[in-house]
Amino acid sequence: MNKLLKLLFISAFFNALCWMILIPIWQYPDEQAHFAQVQNVAELGKVRTVGNDTSYEIALSEKILGTDRNGFGNNKYTYHPEYNIPYSDNAVGLFEGEISNLPRLSKTNLVKDEATVNPPLYYFLGSIAYKLAYNGILFDRVFSVRLMSALIFMGTVFLSFKIGQIIFEKEKLLAITLASLIAFKPMLTFTSTGVLPDTLTNFLFSFILYLSLKILKDGIKFSTLVLISLAVVMGISTRQQFLISTFIVSMALFYQIYRNPKYTKHFVLSILAFALFIYISNTFLINLPFFTNFRVPEIFDTGFLKFDEISFAAFITHLVWTIRHTYSEVWPWYWGVYKWHSLTLPPVYYQVINRLVLVGILGLVIKLILIFRKRETDKRTIYFFFLLASSLIYFLVLTIWDYIFFIGHGFSFGIQGRYFFPLVIAHVAILLMGFWQLFKIFLKNYAKLGLVTLAFLMIVFNDLSLFHIAGSYYDTSSLEIFIAQASQYKPLFVKSNTILFTLTLNIGFQLLLIFYLIKNAIRQTN
């Protein structure tokens, strides 16, 4: 099993490399704005909050690459999935030299306002990766930060395996399957391999999920609480939505306190101390650098003292709208929307996904019936309901936050599918439990071959998605033209034969992984 796990990580890493290489520069969500903040931290030692904050180097590259926004916030790709920049007939882009030959001053000559002003942790780490390629051209530095994001994603894949070990206990193949589904989920890989803080948010949230499950399994330990505190501080220093994680941790703590009431006093004091800290951070310490990361403007600026504007009926209306919006728009985004939200996957992909998810839900219904019929209260059942409750709480808190935002601004913030990725391991694990329930009933001794089939389908979905996206950017009519176009506006070490070599290794490791998954499943079947 250890060899299989190592093979999974190698395969997942090369898959992430392929996404990094084939996705053109500035084609991840707001990548140029996130990179501008990384560049400011690396070059200026601070985040610009007043005046221009984006370098001439980035601005010029945006104009050349078609991602420069107009007055409405749109670029040439927005609403136009057919658009592409003009390509040359070799591995060097038509205007690649203009970007590569810019003077050093172009990195600090700020010409427009576009950089993000997000909490600092990801950008601090990104600045380290940036400096590792400091003397390189723009493409070198972007890919250095992308590689850092991909390595963090490998940490998320590892955590998915560790979480699988807890919730599936002795069923090791289930843990490997969960990690495989996470490693090759295409939209997750996409958002985890660009210059954006999602990958760190997802990793830290997954770590919180893992520690919460450890509390359910082993009880409350001081070392676990220290790690949780550290993860929460790091998470809030990455994304402010990370505050939601405190609700999830609290559930695990509540469970242990219910079993051991002696912890009640310490828990209540901790909750009061945390609430007081949030209040002070949002009132008296709001202008201090570290404490601004804990700011909750939707509560303290618009809704906290305006209870007359909050209506239960209006919230229910907003909740119903959110559920419909989630099904019609957010759900497809969860599985894949690319190219500045202009490119979706072929409809048949979503149709297959929806039917498979319905099969998984059927398995969950059967599982719930069996749990209540047998009155099961074992650890696996506790883990199942914890993951289910965590997912529902996350959705509800996000909906309440969006409702408060709506009160203050008159419109919804606009929830995207990737906003739910912090709990993607929980979502996939829940569905996997449903499938496993069905496999045990209908496949009996061959149930583990069903698990391999799921992993195989996700890998195929990943490859088809990447091919579909790459085909929207590059001419795939011949391998020579495809490699030439994919090489343009990339670092020197990510051109021509390097691309072909990486793609070949990726397919090879995927085939090896599938082979050994099948071999392992057959061995356990016998």
Spans of features found by a protein language model:
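Membrane-lumen/periplasm interface segments of multi-pass, membrane-embedded glycan/lipid transferases
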Residues: 286-371, 486-503
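Membrane-interface alpha helices of multi-pass inner-membrane proteins
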Residues: 224-240, 245
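Perimembrane helix-loop-helix junctions
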Residues: 211-217, 245-276, 369
